[in-house]
Design a protein with these regions (language model features):
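Beta-propeller blade termini and top-face loops
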Residues: 1-295
């Protein structure tokens, strides 16, 4: 709020890596950052979005994902009408679902869109999807909210919906990028061709019996250096200088090996009627966007 020399800072990393640190609520400066006060929501831990009403600077909207490693109540959307002196939780979904993104409509600042994120982070595991991951809409600058995504209007609505990012062109046109954790359909396998998975548990004897031309075709298709042809690979395996599974390890990305999750990943949806209906805009898979989770 440059007009009034007010700066708001939401503390806490809102991405959900194991290394993400929690914050201490909302910080506020009324002198362009020279001094600061804590303006509440200390138990929110992770704040991702702050929206100031362009028509009334006393009205502020906060989106919080809540505690990272445990369930908590101070999450969702909070609104202040007194410049941060007090806060009202205007959207609470449950104690493991928070708000990861909020956008205001450029042509009508009373209309807001927010995305919720269901997740359960542990030091040894991360479930980052659920039915409660959805998009909500407000027409009164955050006083009330309505869920606008469901299984009937074209938007994914199931236990595999992960993090959702929003981009709002106007009150009618909204884009959403979704981390879809549903599995991709299995490709039809051509049995005559070798695949990297074939080498995951293959024995020394089995590898040595592979047809030389077939193995050469596999090595060429997977961009092995020319010095690694079928003969040299078989020699290395025969002398036990390498294991057959080393071919799989070499080809498989470390991240893919770690998670082994052939999921759909990123999808982009568009609504042209204010969120009443949605259409997926991409036909093919959008690769190289999310490598394990979209967090």
């Amino acid at each position: 709020d440059w007009k009034n020399q007010v700066i708001w800072v939401g503390t806490g990393e809102h991405n959900s890596s194991r290394s993400s640190y929690s914050g201490t609520g909302i910080l506020k400066s009324t002198d362009l950052g020279k001094t600061w006060i804590n303006s509440g929501l200390n138990d929110s831990h992770h704040i991702g979005k702050i929206i100031i009403n362009p028509q009334n600077a006393n009205e502020v909207i906060i989106g919080s994902t809540g505690h990272l490693y445990s369930n908590s109540k101070q999450r969702g959307i909070f609104k202040s009408t007194d410049n941060g002196a007090s806060w009202t939780n205007t959207l609470f979904i449950d104690d493991s679902t928070g708000i990861i993104d909020i956008k205001v409509s450029p042509d009508n600042p009373n209309i807001l869109f927010a995305s919720s994120w269901k997740k359960d982070r542990k030091a040894w595991d991360f479930v980052e999807n659920g039915n409660e991951s959805a998009i909500y809409k407000s027409i009164d600058f955050g006083n009330s909210w309505v869920r606008i995504t469901n299984e009937k209007n074209g938007f994914p609505s199931n236990t595999s919906v992960g993090r959702i990012g929003l981009s709002v062109f106007n009150q009618n046109i909204i884009y959403a990028v979704v981390d879809n954790q549903n599995r991709r359909p299995k490709k039809k396998e051509v049995k005559e061709e070798l695949k990297k998975e074939d080498f995951k548990k293959i024995t020394k004897e089995q590898l040595l019996k592979i047809d030389t031309s077939k193995l050469n075709s596999f090595l060429t298709a997977n961009n092995f250096e020319k010095k690694y042809d079928a003969k040299s690979i078989k020699d290395l395996v025969s002398k036990e200088e390498i294991n057959p599974s080393d071919l799989y390890t070499y080809l498989n990305e470390a991240n893919a090996e770690l998670f082994d999750t052939p999921v759909i990943g990123a999808e982009v949806y568009k609504s042209s009627d204010g969120g009443n209906s949605w259409q997926k805009t991409n036909q093919d898979f959008i690769n190289d966007t999310y490598y394990s989770y979209g967090y």
